[in-house]
C-alpha cells in the first residue's frame, strides 16, 4: 500500500466530503419544504395545483435520479438555461427528495383522526388554527420516521450526483 499517495489525496477526500454534505443538507432542507407544500396541496385538494403536485410526484418518483440529473445538466443548456454542477446536484436531489417527502407528509396528514378535527371545530378554532395547532403537530410526529428515512435516502443518492 502506497501511504504517500493516500496522504497526497487525503485533502481531496475531505473536500469531496464537505461538498457532499453541503449538497445533501441543502437538498434535504429544500426537499422538506417542497414536500410539505405539495402534501398540503394534495391533501386539501387545492384545485389546479393539486393536479400539478400529483404530476410532479409521479414524474419524480418514476424516473431515475441519473436521468433527472442528465436532463438538468445537459438538457437545460440546450434550452438556454445554464446551471453549474453544484446547483444541478442540489436541484436534482431536491426534485427527487421533495416527492418522497410529500408522500411522507401526506401520510401523516391523512392519519390525523377526524375526531381531533371535529373537536377543534367544536371549540371554535378557525381552519388555519386547526391546521397549526391540531393537525400539523400530530402529522409531523407521525411523519418523522419516514422523513428520517428519506433524509438518509437523499444522502445515499448524493453519490449519484458525482457521476
Predicted region positions:
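Transmembrane alpha-helices and adjacent helix-loop boundaries
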Residues: 1-163
Amino acid at each position: 500500500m502506497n501511504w504517500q499517495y493516500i496522504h497526497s489525496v487525503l485533502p481531496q477526500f475531505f473536500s469531496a466530503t464537505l461538498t457532499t454534505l453541503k449538497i445533501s443538507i441543502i437538498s434535504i432542507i429544500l426537499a422538506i419544504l417542497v414536500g410539505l407544500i405539495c402534501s398540503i396541496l394534495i391533501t386539501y385538494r387545492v384545485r389546479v395545483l393539486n393536479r400539478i403536485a400529483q404530476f410532479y410526484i409521479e414524474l419524480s418518483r418514476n424516473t431515475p435520479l441519473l436521468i433527472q440529473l442528465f436532463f438538468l445538466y445537459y438538457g437545460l443548456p440546450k434550452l438556454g438555461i445554464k446551471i453549474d454542477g453544484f446547483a444541478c446536484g442540489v436541484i436534482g436531489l431536491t426534485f427527487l427528495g421533495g416527492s418522497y417527502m410529500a408522500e411522507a407528509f401526506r401520510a401523516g396528514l391523512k392519519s390525523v383522526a377526524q375526531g381531533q378535527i371535529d373537536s377543534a371545530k367544536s371549540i371554535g378554532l378557525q381552519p388555519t388554527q386547526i391546521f397549526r395547532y391540531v393537525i400539523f403537530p400530530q402529522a409531523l410526529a407521525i411523519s418523522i420516521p419516514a422523513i428520517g428515512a428519506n433524509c438518509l435516502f437523499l444522502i445515499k443518492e448524493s453519490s449519484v450526483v458525482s457521476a
